[in-house]
Amino acid sequence: MARFSILDLCPDLVEEAVKIEQLHISTQPCIKQESTDISDPSTSIDTTDTMSTDYLHDESIDDERSESTLSKDSKSPSSSNSEEKTPSSPNDKPPFSYNALIMMAIKDSPEKRLTLAGIYEYIVTNYPFYRDNKQGWQNSIRHNLSLNKCFVKVPRNFDDPGKGNYWMLDATAEDEVFIGGATGKLRRRPSSLSRARMDAYKQYGAAAANLFPYFSPGMPALPRHPYLTAPNGFLPRQMMPIPAMPQVFAQPELLQLYINQQQSLFTKLQ
């Protein structure tokens, strides 16, 4: 029996099917080529590279701009400071207090003493500002000489001709007092004895500090007792409060250890 097919009844469908198959075969290489072009790593890398290089190029420009702005900003304060900083003129006011000027005048003198007129002459000679600006600075010099304990008045000898007394530096001020570089004022550095007293007071209390002479740490005042108040309202002089016994006496070995440590300092001070 012969085979029967639907294509025998409709030959037109066969021709259309053949045409569709041929068209499908002809378009398949183009699709493959496009897919290979899209999936080709070289082309994708090139596109990303161009994008990345463009991005890096833009970023480098931004960096250069930022660096230029930073350099300008960093240079601007220095340039402004250089423009603001003008060379100091000798006629400008010196950055020293009157006490510092007096101290410099006395120290620079050959005999380490000067009269009031000699101090004036030193200041006017070394600092022309006071020569041209006479606005009461001489009165300030006199007041500082009389009020500051660093300066001592020394009477003139009978065989020394001239007028006025001499002014010298106190013996303790020569080593302990100095001129501050930042403020231009007199500063007092702590002596070895005062440092030792303060160290003893901080570590062991007032009892250990009293071992050093001329040291009286501030003691809190005791409350006033009722019997100290008179009936008529007259308040007698308050009694000196007795300091509480520090804990250092409860440990004699601790106090003895501290005294042994300070023995070398005691020998130097004697």
UniProtKB/Swiss-Prot annotation:
Q: What is its main location?
A: nucleus
Q: Which UniProt keywords apply?
A: DNA-binding, Nucleus, Transcription, Transcription regulation
Q: Which InterPro entries match?
A: Fork_head_dom, FOXG1, TF_fork_head_CS_1, TF_fork_head_CS_2, WH-like_DNA-bd_sf, WH_DNA-bd_sf
Please report a single Pfam family linked to this protein. Forkhead
Could you tell me what this protein does? Transcription factor. Plays a role in embryogenesis and later development, perhaps acting redundantly with forkhead protein pes-1.
| GO BP | anatomical structure morphogenesis; cell differentiation; dendrite development; embryo development ending in birth or egg hatching; nematode larval development; neuron fate specification; non-motile cilium assembly; positive regulation of transcription by RNA polymerase II
Residue ranges under compositional bias (Low complexity)?
A: 36-54, 76-91
- Mutant phenotype after disruption: RNAi-mediated knockdown by injection into adults causes slow and spatially restricted movement of about 30% of their L1 larval progeny, which nonetheless grow normally and do not display any obvious phenotype as late larvae or adults. However, simultaneous knockdown of forkhead gene pes-1 causes 12% of eggs produced by hermaphrodites to arrest development at late stages of embryogenesis and 81% arrest after hatching as L1 stage larvae.
* Single annotated GO MF: DNA-binding transcription factor activity
Q: Where in the cell is it found?
A: Nucleus
Q: Name one GO cellular component term.
A: nucleus
Q: CDD domains, per this entry?
A: FH_FOXG (cd20021)
Start and end residues of each stretch annotated as Disordered:
32-94
Protein species of origin:
Caenorhabditis elegans
Where does the record place Basic and acidic residues bias?
Answer: 66-75
* Protein name per its UniProtKB record: Forkhead box protein fkh-2
Q: Which residues bind DNA?
A: 93-188
Record-linked PROSITE patterns = FORK_HEAD_1, FORK_HEAD_2, FORK_HEAD_3
